[in-house]
Every structure is written in C-alpha cells, then in structure tokens.
C-alpha cells in the first residue's frame, strides 16, 4: 500500500512523522547532517511514494529525494501550526488564541489567532545555544548526554540572584529571580562541576526565551503561551524553568507531548489531506 510521510528538516534535527502498519502516528529522528542515515531509512520503507517536506533544510533534502519520490513542499510555519492544532485537539485543549514559542536551534515566536498566524519575533538563543555553550564549557556535545547531567546540576554557584545582591534587605522583586546568569563565575571563587554548568546554560536559555515570550504575550494581552520544539523533549529541567517563570508573570505555560514533532505532523497531515 502506498504511503505518505512528513519530514521537518530543521537546522539541527530532522523529524519524520508517518502512520505505521497499525495506522498509529509514529516518529523518527535524525541529525540533519546525517543525510545518509535519513536516505537509508527511507529506502527501507518501500511503501513510501510521497513526502511532504518542511523546515530550513527542506531544499537540501528535496534535491536528494526528488528523483525517487513525489515531493510536496510546505512553509515551515504553516506546517508547525497544522501540527500544533492537531496535537491540541488530541490532548483536549480548547485554545484558539495563544503565543507559540518554538525552541529549535534558535527560537521563533508567533501570535496565533484561530487559523491565522503572525510572526512576533524570535532570538538566536535556543537549542543551538545550549549545545554550543555545553561544548565550549564542558566539551559535551550530545544532547542525550547533556540532559541527565543537567538534572543533577545546581545554578546556585554560578548565577547571581536578586537575593544575593540585596542580602537581608527587602528587595523590590522576588529574591529568587536571576539577576545575572553566570555572574558568580566572574566575581567569586565558587565550587561547581559540569552538571552545574549545564544546568546554568539551560537556565540562561530558558529565561531569555521565556522573557521574550512573556513580552509578546503581554503586548497583545494573551494568556496562554505554548512552548514546543525538540529542545524541550525529555528536558524537564528546561520545562521547569520556563514554566515557573511564565506562571510568575501570571501567564499559562503549555507543553505539548509531541510538540517537537509538530512540523513533521503538520507536513504529514497537509500532504495526506491534499492527496485525499
């Protein structure tokens, strides 16, 4: 039986969404620079005839696949929105207006109004920042190795908090808020290890991304911020940082179970509906 798959070729990861033999939504993930592995996997799936490709590296991958498959292109923001809408429905959320923050290699932020999206902005701080700084500071360069170490790390020896600055004096804002990411590394002798460094890197990224998302949400008086992206996958530490900061500012954070695959899901649904 002929089948269709959706591919989201991102800057760091390439995600694939397809229906398995039991018609269950299934995912595969590869590093985007491992194109040989992607092609080898596709060759083993002999039923695939059509591929819908989205993402920043879609053109590169399309050039390698166009002779073997029918290719459908889709704008990555449209694909992501289709995927997010599908996941929201599956997870029983009834939300029409929200800020969508997609933490990939960098971070892209959109306003979503029903089926309409408007790019609010973004930042170069994202998953690529986590991996780049992790490599520079600890020489650890695999996301799968970063996550377990981050879980046991502490930011206390590296970040300066508001409480550190004010001491016992009453401060105008919450003492637990970060006053300077990595600030203690330059000012005092502090005991820290690789786990602490990795936890602090994630704190930096999480707070920058959340602060920007909150500013956009506040500007348009939007209550819900949906955070997606592969950077959040199994990354409870980063999710907790984002969640607590978002709630502190009286906004509602939402993390979708398969949010990192939303682009691939959207591509699959778009091509499947177009075909039918």
UniProtKB/Swiss-Prot annotation:
What's in the keyword line of the UniProt record?
A: ATP-binding, Coenzyme A biosynthesis, Cytoplasm, Kinase, Nucleotide-binding, Transferase
Matching Pfam families? Fumble
Q: Which domain of life is it from?
A: Bacteria
Output this protein's name. Type II pantothenate kinase
Looking up SUPFAM superfamilies in the UniProt record yields: Actin-like ATPase domain (SSF53067)
Q: Which GO terms describe its biological process?
A: coenzyme A biosynthetic process
Q: Where in the cell is it found?
A: Cytoplasm
Q: Which residues form a coiled coil?
A: none
What organism does the record attribute this protein to? Bacillus cereus (strain ZK / E33L)
Question: Which residues bind ATP per the record?
Answer: 8-15, 105, 127-131, 143, 230
Reactions performed catalytically: (R)-pantothenate + ATP = (R)-4'-phosphopantothenate + ADP + H(+)
Question: What Gene3D superfamilies does the record point to?
Answer: 3.30.420.40
């Amino acid at each position: 039986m002929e089948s269709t798959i959706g591919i989201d070729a991102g800057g760091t990861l390439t995600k694939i969404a397809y229906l398995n033999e039991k018609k269950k939504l299934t995912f595969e993930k590869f590093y985007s620079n491992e194109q040989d592995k992607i092609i080898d996997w596709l060759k083993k799936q002999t039923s695939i005839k059509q591929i819908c490709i989205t993402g920043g590296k879609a053109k590169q991958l399309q050039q390698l696949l166009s002779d073997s498959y029918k290719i459908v292109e889709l704008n990555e923001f449209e694909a992501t929105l289709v995927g997010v809408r599908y996941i929201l429905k599956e997870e029983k959320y009834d939300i029409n207006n929200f800020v969508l923050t997609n933490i990939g290699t960098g971070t892209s932020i959109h306003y979503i109004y029903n089926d309409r999206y408007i790019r609010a902005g973004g930042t170069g701080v994202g998953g690529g920042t986590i991996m780049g700084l992790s490599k520079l500071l600890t020489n650890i360069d695999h996301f799968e190795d970063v996550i377990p170490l981050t879980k046991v790390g502490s930011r206390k020896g590296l970040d300066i908090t508001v409480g550190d600055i004010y001491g016992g004096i009453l401060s105008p804002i919450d003492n637990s808020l970060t006053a300077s990411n990595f600030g203690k590394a330059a000012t005092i002798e502090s005991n820290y290890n690789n786990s602490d460094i990795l936890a602090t890197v994630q704190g930096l990224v999480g707070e920058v991304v959340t602060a920007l998302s909150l500013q956009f949400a506040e500007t348009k008086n939007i209550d819900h911020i949906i955070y997606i992206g592969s950077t959040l996958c199994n990354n409870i530490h980063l999710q907790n940082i984002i969640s607590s900061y978002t709630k502190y500012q009286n906004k509602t954070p939402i993390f979708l179970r398969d949010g990192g695959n939303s682009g691939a899901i959207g591509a699959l649904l778009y091509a499947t509906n177009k075909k039918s």
